[in-house]
């Protein structure tokens, strides 16, 4: 289902000091960081928010009134380094038809994810910093926004790494769904598995299913 999001068009205005006639890019969501990157002062940013009655949909993120909220994209904006994984990746890649109860993301060990977990809507997994970007890919979500998510092979490695916290029925179902995929890449899968030290365990499962 395609959601047509109302874009926010911000034009530079003269507020207090002399502002150039530059035009801000179109944004579905606007943040102080986006404004700052475009040379807009904090004062002008918040004046625009106030004058146009924009709604705060997350910490530091604003959008047009009554705008449909793309939760995945908002999470990405709140924590750009985090990558959607596990349940979220199972569902996105079509390895399960069970929509995630919570958004699942992976971030490097030591990152303070309290802001993401405080409301109970997210489950966070951690990994060594040097392994965080292995298998990372940018995809278009269901609302047309670009978000980071792990590819199929990294997703299967995460499945095996987290097998003790995943229901056995779901584990088997996801793994079988991957095996049935025509676009699977077993060479890449085993390369990743070696990096995450799950190659022996994964090989045993694969020998049974292949």
What are these regions (language model features)?
Residues 2-17:
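Short, positively charged and aromatic/hydrophobic N-terminal segments
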Residues 53-58:
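A short, conserved structural fragment
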Residues 38-49:
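Short amphipathic alpha-helical interaction segments
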Residues 24-34, 49, 61-210:
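Nucleic-acid-binding surface
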Residues 19-23:
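Short helix->loop/beta-hairpin flanking segments within DNA-binding domains
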């Amino acid at each position: 289902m395609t959601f047509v999001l109302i874009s926010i068009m911000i034009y530079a205005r003269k507020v207090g000091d002399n502002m150039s006639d530059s035009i801000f890019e179109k944004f579905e969501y606007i943040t102080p960081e986006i404004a700052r990157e475009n040379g807009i002062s904090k004062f002008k940013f918040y004046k625009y928010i106030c004058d146009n009655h924009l709604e705060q949909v997350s910490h530091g993120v604003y959008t047009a009134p009554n705008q449909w909220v793309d939760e995945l994209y908002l999470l990405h904006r709140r924590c750009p380094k985090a990558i959607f994984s596990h349940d979220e990746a199972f569902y996105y890649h079509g390895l399960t038809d069970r929509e995630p109860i919570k958004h699942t993301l992976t971030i490097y060990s030591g990152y303070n994810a309290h802001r993401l977990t405080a409301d109970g809507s997210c489950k966070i997994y951690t990994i060594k910093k040097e392994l965080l970007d292995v298998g990372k890919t940018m995809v278009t979500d269901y609302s047309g926004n670009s978000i980071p998510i792990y590819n199929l092979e990294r997703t299967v490695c995460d499945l095996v790494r987290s097998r003790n916290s995943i229901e056995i029925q779901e584990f088997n179902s996801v793994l079988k769904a991957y095996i049935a995929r025509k676009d699977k890449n077993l060479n890449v899968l085993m390369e990743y598995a070696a990096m995450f030290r799950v190659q022996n365990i994964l090989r045993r499962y694969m020998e049974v299913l292949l």
